Structures are given as C-alpha cells and as structure tokens.
Amino acid sequence: GSMNWLRIPRPIDRHIVEMSLRQVDMLPLKDRQIGELSGGQKKRTFLARALAQQAHILLLDEPFNGVDVNTERAMIQLLMRLRDAGHTILVSSHDLSAISTVCDQIILINQTILAYGATSEVFTPENLNRTFGMPLPGIMS
C-alpha cells in the first residue's frame, strides 16, 4: 500500500510491514535501530523494505554477501517462493552457487556482456573462465 497524503501509516501499512518483517524473520527485532543490527540482519531488513513496497520486480545487489549460511538458505527459499509466485527478481551477485539456485536466466559481465541465457547454458567452464580470468572448479553447469 501507499501512505496517505499526510504520510501517516494506516493500519494496512503497518500490517504490510509486519508481514514483510515476518517473511525475513526480523519481526522480533522490529523495534531496534538499524545501527544496532548485524550486517546480515540489515540485509534482511532491506529485503523486508523491498517486500513491503509490494513491487513485482525486485532488484537486489549482493543480497547474500555478509549473511550466515542459515540466513542465505532462508533468503534463497523466500526468493524462490517469490519467483514461483510470478515476481521478477534481478540479482547482482558474485555468489554463483546461490544465484544458480534462484535464477532462471544469467548474464555474465566483465566490462561487457560475455554470456547470457539459461543458467545451464551460461555456467560453462569456458564462460566462467572468461568472466573471472581463471578456472572455477566446483561450479557445475
């Protein structure tokens, strides 16, 4: 929802924020100041902020950077549910494992677009070597 012209949150606005915080497991920390949160908690809070806007397109910059393994797993599951519900999710990330799970389409960029398409077609040893300048063992296509 959008706030009224006085910018006073309505009950529906508060409900949307509460639901967004619940989705990222931050509701118990809702009364904390942002400076009191860890890096991973801030990432989840920023994701909740994006969810509260109820947009169908999400643009996320390094969403998995600085979060623990359990938080990353929970975020991936949430993003997959959003994707399956019809949301478009654009992710800028160096975490190839996480994005290969979440993303259907990949663009590899190193000063220019080197490869794009379905994850299985793009994540080849040749493309990854061209992108990162070295072989990346363990990243499977």
Regions found by a protein language model. Name each.
Residues 111-121:
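Conserved switch/coupling elements of ABC/ABC-like ATPase nucleotide-binding domains
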Residues 93-94:
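H-loop/switch region of ABC-family ATPase nucleotide-binding domains
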